[in-house]
């Protein structure tokens, strides 16, 4: 790899107006956010969520003085802000560094079986599965782990799988300055497995193809890679 990498800017609240940050979330597959989504700090969000979750547990009939659950509202609030939904905080966007493709590798690069942990925005229960991504370099490459980090960043927010698939594809296009990107996600939805129909065997597959991957032969090659 080249010794003079090109850094792709990472969003920072100090550098961007709220309108700029919201624009980051509002691509073709936008995350539904209200206009004041970034006014509270993470600590303020934790405090507010903990208060509301205490009320939820109390309404359900739980005794919040019990040793086992007295700290549950705060634990849940921290988990929501710092882990489960950390993809809603722009500062958590992965910092991407581009490197020159010194080896002039011109074939398809595939990263498969990337772990996906997300949350269904309809019932707030887990989505878990695998993402498979591929691209053709136009002269720049990024570290392989950055593909995993991009998938994780967009997964860590309330999601529908279709939007997640498009958001990951768009992020890879931006990071690599290429339109030749493919993303397939195969995931299990706990809203299907644990409630309603209670089907524990089904999974949902979504795909987004662009550029060279619109060619049937190229797409076939990619699908053969991820099935092998």
Labelled PLM ranges:
Residues 2-228:
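A domain-level signal for the structural core that forms small-molecule/cofactor-binding pockets
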């Amino acid at each position: 790899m080249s010794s003079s990498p090109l850094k792709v800017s990472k969003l920072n609240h100090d550098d961007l107006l709220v309108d700029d940050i919201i624009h980051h979330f509002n691509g073709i597959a936008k995350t539904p956010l209200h206009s004041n989504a970034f006014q509270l700090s993470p600590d303020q969000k934790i405090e507010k969520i903990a208060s509301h979750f205490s009320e939820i547990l109390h309404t359900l009939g739980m005794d919040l003085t019990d040793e086992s659950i007295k700290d549950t509202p705060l634990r849940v609030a921290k988990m929501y802000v710092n882990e489960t939904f950390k993809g809603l905080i722009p500062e958590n966007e992965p910092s991407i560094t581009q490197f020159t493709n010194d080896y002039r590798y011109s074939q398809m690069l595939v990263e498969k079986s990337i772990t996906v942990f997300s949350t269904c925005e309809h019932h707030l229960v887990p989505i878990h599965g695998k993402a498979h991504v591929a691209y053709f370099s136009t002269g720049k490459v990024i570290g392989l782990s950055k593909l995993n980090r991009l998938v994780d960043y967009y997964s860590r927010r309330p999601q529908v799988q279709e939007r997640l698939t498009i958001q990951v594809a768009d992020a890879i296009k931006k990071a690599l300055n290429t339109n030749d990107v493919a993303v397939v996600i195969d995931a299990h939805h706990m809203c299907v497995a644990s409630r309603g129909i209670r089907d524990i065997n089904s999974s949902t597959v979504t795909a987004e193809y662009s550029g060279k991957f619109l060619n049937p032969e190229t797409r076939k090659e990619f699908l053969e890679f991820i099935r092998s």
